[in-house]
Amino acid sequence: VGTMLVTGSGAPTCAMVYKLTERENSAGDMQPVAKKSKDKATVPGRKLAFRSYEYALADCEHVISGSEEQLAAYQPEEGWKDLLVGYVSNGEINSDYQGHEAIVNAHNYRAQALAELPIGAQSLMKGDPVIPTEITVL
Protein backbone atom coordinates (compact mmCIF):
# COMPACT_ATOMS: atom_id res chain seq x y z
CA VAL A 1 0.00 0.00 0.00
CA GLY A 2 2.94 2.31 0.50
CA THR A 3 3.77 4.74 3.26
CA MET A 4 0.71 6.99 3.04
CA LEU A 5 -2.95 6.06 2.66
CA VAL A 6 -4.74 8.31 0.17
CA THR A 7 -8.36 9.14 0.95
CA GLY A 8 -9.50 9.88 -2.60
CA SER A 9 -8.63 11.30 -5.98
CA GLY A 10 -6.96 14.66 -5.55
CA ALA A 11 -7.26 14.47 -1.76
CA PRO A 12 -4.31 14.58 0.63
CA THR A 13 -3.18 11.54 2.55
CA CYS A 14 -4.65 10.95 5.98
CA ALA A 15 -1.19 10.63 7.60
CA MET A 16 -1.49 7.00 8.59
CA VAL A 17 -0.17 3.65 7.43
CA TYR A 18 -2.33 0.68 6.49
CA LYS A 19 -0.93 -2.79 7.24
CA LEU A 20 -2.79 -5.74 5.74
CA THR A 21 -2.55 -8.66 8.20
CA GLU A 22 -5.11 -11.13 6.87
CA ARG A 23 -7.37 -11.64 3.88
CA GLU A 24 -10.38 -13.78 3.06
CA ASN A 25 -9.58 -16.76 0.82
CA SER A 26 -11.92 -18.27 -1.79
CA ALA A 27 -13.46 -20.58 0.85
CA GLY A 28 -14.41 -17.57 3.00
CA ASP A 29 -11.79 -18.27 5.66
CA MET A 30 -9.45 -15.60 6.97
CA GLN A 31 -5.84 -16.27 5.99
CA PRO A 32 -2.89 -14.50 7.68
CA VAL A 33 -0.55 -12.49 5.43
CA ALA A 34 2.74 -10.77 6.25
CA LYS A 35 5.22 -8.39 4.69
CA LYS A 36 8.56 -10.12 4.17
CA SER A 37 10.77 -7.37 2.79
CA LYS A 38 14.06 -6.80 4.60
CA ASP A 39 13.74 -4.65 7.75
CA LYS A 40 9.95 -4.41 7.29
CA ALA A 41 8.74 -7.89 8.21
CA THR A 42 5.38 -8.02 9.96
CA VAL A 43 3.63 -10.58 12.15
CA PRO A 44 0.67 -12.00 10.20
CA GLY A 45 -2.88 -12.45 11.44
CA ARG A 46 -5.33 -10.70 13.71
CA LYS A 47 -3.93 -8.85 16.72
CA LEU A 48 -4.95 -7.10 19.90
CA ALA A 49 -3.46 -3.73 20.85
CA PHE A 50 -3.13 -2.25 24.31
CA ARG A 51 -1.33 0.63 25.99
CA SER A 52 0.14 0.49 29.48
CA TYR A 53 0.77 3.42 31.78
CA GLU A 54 3.10 4.51 34.54
CA TYR A 55 2.29 7.61 36.59
CA ALA A 56 -0.67 8.35 34.23
CA LEU A 57 1.64 8.50 31.19
CA ALA A 58 1.77 5.92 28.41
CA ASP A 59 4.91 3.83 28.75
CA CYS A 60 4.44 0.98 26.26
CA GLU A 61 2.30 -0.28 23.38
CA HIS A 62 1.51 -4.00 23.54
CA VAL A 63 0.65 -5.92 20.36
CA ILE A 64 -0.66 -9.44 20.98
CA SER A 65 -0.82 -11.93 18.09
CA GLY A 66 -2.27 -15.44 18.07
CA SER A 67 -5.09 -17.66 16.89
CA GLU A 68 -8.72 -16.52 17.17
CA GLU A 69 -9.12 -18.80 20.19
CA GLN A 70 -5.98 -17.50 21.89
CA LEU A 71 -6.95 -13.88 21.33
CA ALA A 72 -10.51 -14.47 22.58
CA ALA A 73 -9.14 -15.96 25.82
CA TYR A 74 -6.36 -13.38 26.30
CA GLN A 75 -6.58 -11.23 29.43
CA PRO A 76 -4.49 -8.04 29.41
CA GLU A 77 -2.75 -6.88 32.54
CA GLU A 78 -4.69 -4.66 34.91
CA GLY A 79 -4.60 -1.01 33.85
CA TRP A 80 -3.89 -1.69 30.17
CA LYS A 81 -6.10 0.30 27.80
CA ASP A 82 -7.62 -1.50 24.80
CA LEU A 83 -6.73 0.48 21.66
CA LEU A 84 -8.95 -1.38 19.18
CA VAL A 85 -12.21 0.30 18.21
CA GLY A 86 -15.02 -1.44 16.31
CA TYR A 87 -16.05 1.16 13.72
CA VAL A 88 -17.60 -1.41 11.36
CA SER A 89 -18.92 -4.90 12.13
CA ASN A 90 -20.30 -7.25 9.48
CA GLY A 91 -20.55 -4.32 7.07
CA GLU A 92 -22.57 -2.18 9.51
CA ILE A 93 -21.18 1.15 10.73
CA ASN A 94 -21.30 1.58 14.51
CA SER A 95 -23.68 4.52 15.03
CA ASP A 96 -21.56 5.72 17.98
CA TYR A 97 -19.07 6.99 15.38
CA GLN A 98 -21.47 8.93 13.15
CA GLY A 99 -22.72 12.50 13.32
CA HIS A 100 -21.69 15.71 15.04
CA GLU A 101 -21.45 14.21 18.54
CA ALA A 102 -19.02 11.58 17.24
CA ILE A 103 -16.77 14.33 15.84
CA VAL A 104 -16.79 16.16 19.19
CA ASN A 105 -16.03 12.90 21.00
CA ALA A 106 -13.15 12.14 18.59
CA HIS A 107 -11.70 15.61 19.20
CA ASN A 108 -11.87 15.11 22.97
CA TYR A 109 -10.42 11.59 22.74
CA ARG A 110 -7.47 12.87 20.69
CA ALA A 111 -6.75 15.59 23.27
CA GLN A 112 -6.85 13.03 26.09
CA ALA A 113 -4.64 10.59 24.16
CA LEU A 114 -2.03 13.31 23.51
CA ALA A 115 -2.07 14.29 27.19
CA GLU A 116 -1.24 10.67 28.10
CA LEU A 117 1.95 10.66 26.01
CA PRO A 118 5.35 11.64 27.42
CA ILE A 119 6.17 15.33 26.86
CA GLY A 120 8.94 14.43 24.40
CA ALA A 121 6.34 12.95 22.05
CA GLN A 122 5.37 16.41 20.83
CA SER A 123 8.89 17.24 19.67
CA LEU A 124 9.66 14.09 17.71
CA MET A 125 10.77 13.98 14.12
CA LYS A 126 8.71 11.94 11.67
CA GLY A 127 9.34 8.25 12.23
CA ASP A 128 10.70 8.42 15.77
CA PRO A 129 8.86 6.12 18.21
CA VAL A 130 6.95 7.88 20.96
CA ILE A 131 7.02 4.90 23.31
CA PRO A 132 8.33 1.34 22.86
CA THR A 133 6.18 -1.39 21.32
CA GLU A 134 6.32 -4.95 22.63
CA ILE A 135 5.04 -7.73 20.37
CA THR A 136 3.84 -10.96 21.98
CA VAL A 137 3.03 -14.01 19.86
CA LEU A 138 0.83 -16.42 21.81
What spans do the regions from the language model cover?
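Gly/Ser/Thr/Ala-enriched C-terminal appendages of enzymes
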Residues: G2-L138
